[in-house]
Curated annotation (Swiss-Prot):
Organism lineage: Bacteria, Bacillati, Bacillota, Clostridia, Peptostreptococcales
Binding site for ATP: K267
InterPro entries reported in the protein's UniProt record: Cys-tRNA-ligase (IPR015803), Cys-tRNA-synt_Ia_DALR (IPR015273), Cys-tRNA/MSH_ligase (IPR024909), CysS_C (IPR056411), Rossmann-like_a/b/a_fold (IPR014729), tRNA-synt_1_cat_dom (IPR032678), tRNAsynth_Ia_anticodon-bd (IPR009080)
UniProt-recorded name of the protein: Cysteine--tRNA ligase
Annotated source species: Alkaliphilus oremlandii (strain OhILAs)
HAMAP family for this protein: Cys_tRNA_synth
Short sequence motif named 'KMSKS' region, residue ranges: 264-268
UniProt keyword Metal-binding, yes or no: yes
Domain of life assignment: Bacteria
Length: 464
């Protein structure tokens, strides 16, 4: 498997630190609001990458943090007249809800900044002790001039960065590029005791400290959105490597922007959509399919027309799945013919093509193209005349390859929730004496193969 490493600007063979194991960290959200679908793209890519690494036989430990103390959280808390932790806890819950609707599984560990304060303070103290950071009026800054490789991730020299740095009035910093590791307390803001007085951590140090605590001083894969290359990830490398004297991460992966009218989707431009807004028009699995149908490093221009096209593509895969499920229910346990044996053997080539495609810098777009080729092959060879074994082999491979990407998961659980929702809607219609709507819901469900039975214990349903 090869991955494009932002650090080296080239594809490299993926060789984990420890054979068969992967330690991966992705920067998570600052929890002051609902995340938008531009953020969702990054979360989905790392979710799918983790699934694929597991599929390829790796034991993956995946960490994605929550930034639960931040200026934006404090600002919103003040606007609403509540404590900052009330805001962060609310939007952590909302994150998990929205992530779930997009098929994003929970990371192995979701650390919060506020639960790792001792580790953060110890990290800052070590940097001060080693001469890489200095205290100034209750703040602690990282001394960029003491880290010679600063700029290696973003491919910028220290001289160029200094020349381009905005002239800011900060008498406490030695250099405009020096960044805060610890910020002294302000009235009315959350703070923690430290050797430099009460305060709270800077943004960059949080991820370094949590990655070290949960994954070690050197990790396999670190990543996030493309907007994090500089300064966030650049600063993480500087402080982590200055602290440990070791390489921080072997592979740096960054996800391309999701654009609207060729401009990056962002809250600051107010050109964003949340998953909840998209769900008013589309099943959110269509959004996942749309995102994974492009290479993760390429920017995507978002539009409803493109999402509609993605829906049509995903519908074709569902049609293939549904056809095979119908054939499975009706297939005869007959002997496998020689032609079928050749067909079943030939299915392996699609699995190999899929792995070859996705192994090449996690190219899910080409992987999905292989899945469509597989469906076409199945459609041209499988019918009611085939043995159950041939149908099963086709179905199993389709579900295996789509499952790796978290696709074709709708049915089962989602179907049950939808049925229960429609039953509740029908009950309300009957209470309101809206019998036309009540009958329509019953008939619509019957068309989908679901029969409702009114009993003394309430409405029950069964499949035809």
């Amino acid at each position: 498997m090869k991955l494009y490493n932002t650090l080296t600007r080239k594809k490299e063979e993926f060789i984990p630190l420890e054979e068969g194991k992967v330690r991966m960290y992705a920067c998570g959200p600052t929890v002051y609001n609902y995340f938008h679908i531009g953020n969702a793209r990054t979360f989905m890519v790392f979710d799918a990458l983790r699934r694929y690494l597991i599929y390829r036989g790796y034991d993956v430990t995946f960490v994605q943090n929550f930034t639960d103390v931040d200026d934006k959280i404090i600002r919103r808390a003040n606007e609403e007249g509540v404590a900052p932790e009330e805001i962060s806890e609310r939007f952590i819950k909302e994150y998990f809800y929205d992530a779930g609707t997009l098929g994003i599984e929970k990371a192995d560990i979701h650390p919060k900044v506020t639960e790792n304060m001792a580790e953060i303070i110890a990290f800052v103290a070590k940097l001060v002790e080693k001469g890489h950071a200095y205290e100034s009026n209750g703040d602690v800054y990282f001394d960029v001039s003491k880290y010679e490789e600063y700029g290696k991730l973003s491919k910028q020299s220290l001289e160029d960065l200094q020349a381009g740095a905005r002239i800011e009035i900060n008498e406490y910093k030695k250099n405009p590029l020096d960044f805060a590791l610890w910020k002294s307390a302000k009235a009315g803001e959350p703070s923690w005791e430290s050797p430099w007085g009460n305060g709270r951590p800077g943004w960059h140090i949080e991820c370094s400290a949590m990655a070290k605590r949960y994954l070690g001083e050197t990790i396999d894969i670190h990543g996030g959105g493309g907007d994090l290359v500089f300064p966030h990830h650049e600063n993480e490398i500087a402080q982590s490597e200055a602290c440990s004297g070791k390489k921080f991460a072997n592979y740096w992966l960054h996800v391309g922007y999701l654009n609207v009218d060729n401009k990056k989707m962002s809250k600051s431009l107010n050109n964003f959509f949340t998953p909840r807004e998209i769900s008013e028009e589309f099943d959110l699995e269509n959004l996942r399919f749309f995102m994974l149908s492009a290479h993760y490093r390429n920017p995507i221009n978002f539009s409803r027309d493109l999402l509609e096209a993605a829906k049509n593509g995903l519908d074709r895969l569902y049609t293939g799945k549904n056809n095979l499920e119908y054939l499975l229910e009706n297939a005869a346990e007959r002997e496998v013919s020689e032609e079928e044996k050749n067909f079943i053997h030939g299915l392996q080539s699609f699995k190999n093509q899929f792995i070859d495609a996705v192994d090449d810098d996690f190219n899910t777009a080409d992987g999905i193209a292989v899945i469509f080729d597989l469906v076409r092959e199945i459609n041209s060879h499988i019918s009611e005349k085939n043995s159950k074994k041939a149908v099963e082999a086709s179905y199993d491979l389709l579900m295996e390859l789509t499952g790796v990407l978290g696709l074709l998961k709708r049915e089962a659980e989602d179907l049950e929730e939808e049925i229960e929702r429609l039953i509740a809607e029908r009950q309300q219609a009957r209470k309101d004496k809206n019998f036309a709507l009540s009958d329509k819901i019953r008939d619509d469900l019957k068309e989908k193969g679901i029969v409702l039975e009114d009993t003394a214990q309430g409405v029950k349903w069964r499949k035809l």
